[in-house]
Design a protein with these regions (language model features):
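Long, contiguous binding/interaction regions
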Residues: 1-56, 63-111
Length: 111
């Protein structure tokens, strides 16, 4: 199994199709603890909730995720509060999932 966290996210200009369910399940096996859900338009996204001891730990984690997102030019939706951080990842340009989404998830898991 390749280590997705060592790959680089590739910018998407919308010229590729989103992953189908078989591709999603293949890549989902390469990341730990992430779930696949549907947006209102039925497109897929990755989601994971991280737990922390307090607000400060959550905020520090968000800052680290933000740094990775900037390095990779791939930006997740983030919500956080006392003791938690929820990360939602998908490729906006294709309204679905692509390899870069799984790469970003793997990099976040390395924090």
């Amino acid at each position: 199994m390749s280590d997705l966290s060592k790959k680089k996210c590739v910018a998407c200009d919308g010229n590729i199709p989103p992953f189908d369910t078989s591709e999603i399940h293949k890549y989902l096996k390469k990341i730990d603890g992430w779930d696949v859900k549907n947006n209102e338009d039925k497109s897929y996204y990755l989601i994971k909730i991280f737990k922390f001891k307090n607000f400060e730990e959550s905020q520090n984690f968000v800052n680290k995720v933000g740094h990775i997102a900037e390095e990779e030019s791939h930006h997740p939706d983030i919500s956080f509060g006392w003791g938690y951080c929820k990360i939602k990842i998908f490729t906006h340009a294709i309204k679905g999932l692509a390899e870069s989404d799984f790469i970003l998830a793997a990099k976040i898991d390395k924090i």
